[in-house]
Amino acid sequence: MRRSTAIVIAVLALIMLPLTLPLTTSTAEAQPADGVIHVSASAAQGGDGSADKPYATIAEALKDAQAGATIEVGDGTYREGELSVDKSVTIRAAQGAAPVLSGAEVPTSWSASGGSEGSGSAGTWSTSADMVRFCTVCTTNADPSAEGMAAHPEQVFVDGKPLTQVASRAEVTDSTFYVDDNDPITMKEPGNNRAGFNVKPHRGASYVIGVDPSQHTVEVAQHSRALSLLSDNITLSGLTVEKYSPVQEWNYTDPEIGGNTGGVMVFASGTGLNVTGNTFRYSGAGSALGIANAHDATVSDNHLVDNGGVGMGINRSSNVTVENNLWSGNNSKGFITKDCGAYCAMSDTKVTHSENVRYAYNTVDYSQSGTDHSELSSWTNNRQVAIWFDEGVLNSSVLASHFVNVPTAVFVEVSKGNTVASNLIEGAGVGIQVAGSESTRVWNNTVTHALTSISVYEDERSNGCNARGSDGSCTLTESWSAEHGLTWDTVDTSIYNNILSSEQVPTDGDTWRYSAMVQVTGAKNADG
């Protein structure tokens, strides 16, 4: 959980530069008489956006919307992707409706091999080899092989339930799938994706499953990005956004969709952003929701659940309110969370290079995970963080939130002037962790059933420098922290009026440090 310069969230701002967008809005036509553009998944083609003749797709509505328009989305599933919004519009669910924006398609052409479902003999079914090819080496880890199958962002769902991806056709069962690709995207330098990628055609993969698709509804994720919200005063409200497969890296340029391959399922920037009452789930490898260069934004009453990697990221933003949201089941792919150096990012929410972020009244709940994360056996391998302030988060707060059975609840790292107050943490590896941060206030929290309730330690880095040469000169400056004069030293930490109870009891073989309710550890500024 160190040197996070290369993390997926920290590069969110880059999407503003190379983004290639296949859908662009055009000069608007006349708006419907009631001022609302209507969309219905069951509508016939050729609609005009009126209540009587709604559009059949969100893309059509976006194309014709004027700045200030409201797009009202009716019930149904909208299988669309790589949508770009560059005007101030509201996209909302119609009253009483539960629309789903899905990146998955339902293949209609399958070929069978072997036995049949339920016959007792193994059988597989394959799509044609014209499905979308996703990058399986585009991880924040420079060596994708270290991540195993987590590096593969592909997704298949049978009757709404996700299958587990496997590495060979021989491993396919009724609960797994395999992607057969004879010409996959590769790295220019084996074992180091930082050297770049060998770009391949957008399509060319075949999906293999172990159930008869004629007896089930089979969905295959075929889009990387759902939405890019790129203007001021955009509202997204009441939608379920699901089953997209963004990769973690931002710098793979697909020949058809360009930079939309990477980073996030939904990207949002601008002033006056409002994201409320949505569900973001089943994002393949990249973050479900990524916010960058946003100001005066509100993210409230959303569910970010069951995503392959990070739930939400915030970067280079200010005055962002994050309230009354729920996170659960994220990092379902199982990305590495321990000893991962520069690419550590796995969290429910990661905030970087930002100020005045208010995270309040939220819930992060892993009570259904089947693992007691206060046990040493969990902490040994799982360091996922519920809410993580990193690399220059300024004057922000984590308030009145509830964390249930999480590896790490709150982590404040190399930041300044932040408050962690009035939170309830029930079960954790570490409840509250502060590292290399100035003027952190830890007040009025309750931590129960944790391996360590509060941990405060000195980060070995200093003055916004991630690495130094043998002569002591900085060779890797973190520009935001350096510009804001951060020392990256743990000073002026205030721990006041907290309740710490029911600490996890050490067992045979545990070392002394795991029995402490509160740890305070010093270090030299020797690394960076």
Language-model features and meaning:
Residues P246-A268, A285-A292, D296-A297, D306-G528:
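Glycine- and acidic/polar-rich repeat regions and solenoidal domains
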Residues V36-H38, S42-A268, L273-N274, S473, ...:
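Extracellular polysaccharide-degrading/modifying enzymes targeting complex plant/algal/animal polysaccharides
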Residues L83-P107, H152, K161-Q165, D301, ...:
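Internal hydrophobic scaffold segments of catalytic domains
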Residues L17-D34:
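C-terminal region of N-terminal signal peptides and the immediate post-cleavage residues
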Residues L273-R281:
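Surface-exposed extracellular loop regions of Gram-negative outer-membrane beta-barrel proteins
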Residues R3-I15:
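Sec-dependent N-terminal signal peptides
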Residues E60-K63, R281, T419:
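Asp/Glu-centered strand-loop micro-motifs enriched in Gly/Pro and often flanked by an aromatic residue
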